[in-house]
């Protein structure tokens, strides 16, 4: 056997698209690597720029992987007999550490930019500033407070409902990210889309299908179909409203906006789950 494979064979080995089995795994690992601080073995890690035009469909699956450390903490805290409030705090802290507060950073930048900029250019300039202003601080506090109240309320109702709702929220919110990213033009030339491309329509549709499939988890946990309907309605309202706001304020999407919609969608979904609950 030759030690120097032909060009054709070499390209098939190096290109993850060439393997119908390896490609989905490669996409999920690339998304986990991009969206979190979870350690990926060097042999499995993607050392090249990820192809999110074709691979962003895996964001919701990555969301399921990313929430595993927080889920483990939630279960361990429950088995130790801790109350709902403590479990919720530990879960939220673990999730923020796992993601590096990536999406919360986007929410804070959006709040500062939209709240403090007088025009489009100034808003985009503020959003690139790494410091957190008053609007960003308020947005961060409110977002963490809302998730604490919502998760602890679900834990008070049912531990299994809280687990199902938490997992589904991580999956659905990241499927919405992909659709949001695909549906809007880039607001700046040096933004996320210029670096990684824009998700294809097929990627966005696949992500939404995966997100929709995660709704089975709350149903299995005896969440009312009416509660899920409210959750979906709230997600759509949040998505449509935030999408219009981004168009009006900066003319499209940025990485910060894509991060912010994840947090907003997660909150909207959890609010809906608590409706019609006994």
Where are these regions (language model features)?
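Hydrophobic alpha-helical transmembrane segments
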Residues: 2-100, 114, 119-122, 129-253, ...
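Glycine/small-residue-rich loop that forms an oxyanion/phosphate-binding "nest" at active or ligand-binding sites
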Residues: 105, 125
């Amino acid at each position: 056997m030759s030690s120097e494979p032909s060009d054709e064979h070499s390209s098939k080995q190096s290109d993850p698209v060439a393997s119908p089995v390896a490609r989905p795994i490669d996409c999920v690992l690339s998304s986990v690597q991009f969206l979190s601080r979870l350690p990926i073995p060097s042999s499995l890690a993607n050392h090249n720029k990820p192809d999110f035009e074709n691979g962003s469909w895996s964001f919701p699956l990555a969301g399921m992987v990313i929430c595993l450390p927080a889920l483990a903490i939630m279960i361990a805290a429950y088995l130790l007999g801790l109350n709902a409030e403590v479990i919720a705090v530990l879960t939220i802290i673990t999730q923020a550490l796992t993601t590096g507060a990536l999406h919360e950073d986007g929410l804070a930048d959006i709040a500062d930019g939209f709240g403090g900029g007088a025009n489009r250019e100034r808003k985009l300039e503020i959003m690139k500033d790494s410091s957190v202003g008053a609007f960003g601080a308020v947005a961060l506090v409110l977002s963490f407070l809302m998730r604490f109240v919502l998760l602890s309320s679900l834990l008070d109702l049912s531990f299994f409902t809280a687990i199902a709702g938490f997992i589904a929220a991580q999956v659905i919110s990241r499927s919405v990210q992909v659709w949001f990213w695909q549906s809007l033009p880039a607001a700046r030339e040096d933004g996320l889309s210029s670096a990684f491309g824009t998700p294809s329509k097929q990627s966005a549709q696949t992500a939404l299908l995966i997100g929709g499939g995660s709704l089975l988890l709350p149903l299995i946990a005896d969440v009312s179909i009416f509660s899920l309907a409210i959750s979906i309605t709230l997600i759509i309202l949040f998505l449509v409203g935030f999408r219009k706001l981004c168009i009006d304020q900066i003319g499209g999407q940025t990485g910060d906006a894509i991060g912010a919609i994840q947090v907003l969608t997660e909150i909207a979904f959890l609010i809906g789950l608590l409706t019609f609950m006994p």
